[in-house]
Amino acid sequence: MAREFSLAKTRNIGIMAHVDAGKTTTTERILYYTGKIHKIGETHEGASQMDWMEQEQERGITITSAATTAQWDGHRVNIIDTPGHVDFTIEVQRSLRVLDGAVTVLDSQSGVEPQTETVWRQATEYGVPRIVFANKMDKIGADFLYSVQTLHDRLQANAHPIQLPIGSEDDFRGIIDLIKMKAEIYTNDLGTDILEEDIPEEYLEQAQEYREKLIEAVAETDEDLMMKYLEGEEITNEELVAGIRKATINVEFFPVLCGSAFKNKGVQLMLDAVIAYLPSPLDIPAIKGVNPDTDAEEERPASDEEPFAALAFKIMTDPFVGRLTFFRVYSGVLNSGSYVMNTSKGKRERIGRILQMHANSRQEIETVYAGDIAAAVGLKDTTTGDSLTDEKAKIILESIEVPEPVIQLMVEPKSKADQDKMGIALQKLAEEDPTFRVETNVETGETVIAGMGELHLDVLVDRMRREFKVEANVGAPQVSYRETFRASTQARGFFKRQSGGKGQFGDVWIEFTPNEEGKGFEFENAIVGGVVPREFIPAVEKGLIESMANGVLAGYPMVDVKAKLYDGSYHDVDSSETAFKIAASLALKEAAKTAQPAILEPMMLVTITAPEDNLGDVMGHVTARRGRVDGMEAHGTSQIVRAYVPLAEMFGYATVLRSATQGRGTFMMVFDHYEDVPKSVQEEIIKKNKGE
């Protein structure tokens, strides 16, 4: 099957927003218009709308699907969903990684909100071009120009309106196009009847003023336009559109549009802007990666002629087809039934069926081309962030960084039947979400789940109940502490048992030294002359790894330690792997006496937004929670405080902040790094763990 849409006519976009800005409704309306109405003004039978909703209820995944394909104005638009909540930053990161452009949805009453800032910052880091859609223009208190101002004040974004609203709140009835200088008036609430007419007299002056500002802002990004502008020559609409497109793709300019997705106003014009101003895969730099055989950096331009290279960005379990791996093709062509190399894992994978999610159905396709986004069925070893490439032209694309989980809960199945189901459910959820970990406590047999925050774990436990029908009791959230050594030491581990039958004998000398932060455990074999036979050395390493899973102070996993095995002895008959494993664990226990073991705790970067009057309270909250303030900035009448605070001190803070600020304060936190806990706190943690 030949390529249906050229690369120039392909758009891969995401819809990003703060939690309640109306992202889902916007996505839903986009799918609704692109799936059913190919040009504005087509009448639309009620029946088709019904099928669409039924289909959605039956599967419930259309809107939340990782990637949906739609068509608009002769272009293919792939929409990648991004969640708005901070606990799901990995979802946002992984979607930004495979996007070429994005639509940032604002609530036009609130403008830029804290989570908009987080997502905007991440999009800037990834260099993603954006257009802004000020939604909810029909809402009480909606104020388009205030929203535009918040883009300047809070994000320092060079954002300018390319539209103005006609009316607001209940009177919101149309949109002025500042490029064509025409008014689009809506005559019904379906958004299907639009009259294009001259700008109403009372709006003309404002429209001319904002068109002038728009031309000036765009001219500043382009020398040729600037010359024309300064010489007083007229800039044509075509030149203006080309200038906006170039500046938007270079992430120097952000066009702002308005509308109400709920009332079906402005969505089609926003889709026109996606086509006009956001990049195709040809407009962005070629993706870079490393050749695993030569370690040389290579790039893959977006072209069907290049060797196949793709990035898996999400795993989902679908009730109808099983495990789906969503991937973005950067170069080359892939046919279903073919084999690819997962270069991240070094494993060969067979691509079973290839599916594309359409606005309201799934379609099985034979071939995917460069720039496409699709889902494959049948991949066994591939997880989020893995590269899939041609077996003859291997490349490892830059992966998606996965943050370490910082909070954990104990989950306990309510019945024996639940126990078996829970194991399967947790395994599937962990496959889908790399920031979610499942561990079993060796001593107690309890199952512990770990994730990025309380909401993250709540959602996963809820999914376990709803999707997998598992009933479980859930413990209170706990902090994921770590342990390490802060000093170097040498220790002997000697294990000998001789009481009838075959004896046991293992003897090792190990030097322990602190490792760099984040480097984990490293083992070095420095045995000379065979004092410990080669076949027992892996057993020594294994013995250390197993013992370090339950650390020496309070049973938390040990990290960032180097161990060098440098001496020992053995017995011809009695030595065994088991004996050397035990000897290694005894050496670790012995080392703990002199290696200054320490407990580490997760430190969160907390951003607190509160009214200026409450600044004193907020500073007090940070200090009382063993935190340290990193910086402050004023935002209108609010203050934003950035601070590092231990996660252990942040439980229940939402309630404290709410009552101190009469509900006007908000905060967000993300994991930043691990730090030693103070001695007094360390003693409490040890006491608590020994007492249990």
UniProtKB/Swiss-Prot annotation:
Determine if Nucleotide-binding is one of this entry's keywords. Answer: yes
| Listed PROSITE patterns | G_TR_1, G_TR_2
Cellular location(s): Cytoplasm
Residues that span the membrane, as ranges: none
Q: Which GO terms describe its cellular component?
A: cytoplasm
Q: Does the keyword Endoplasmic reticulum apply?
A: no
Give each disulfide bond as a residue pair: none
Listed SMART domains = EFG_C, EFG_IV
Binding residue positions for GTP: 17-24, 81-85, 135-138
Could you say which protein family the record assigns here?
Belongs to the TRAFAC class translation factor GTPase superfamily. Classic translation factor GTPase family. EF-G/EF-2 subfamily.
Q: Please give the name of this protein.
A: Elongation factor G
Q: Give the species.
A: Streptococcus equi subsp. equi (strain 4047)
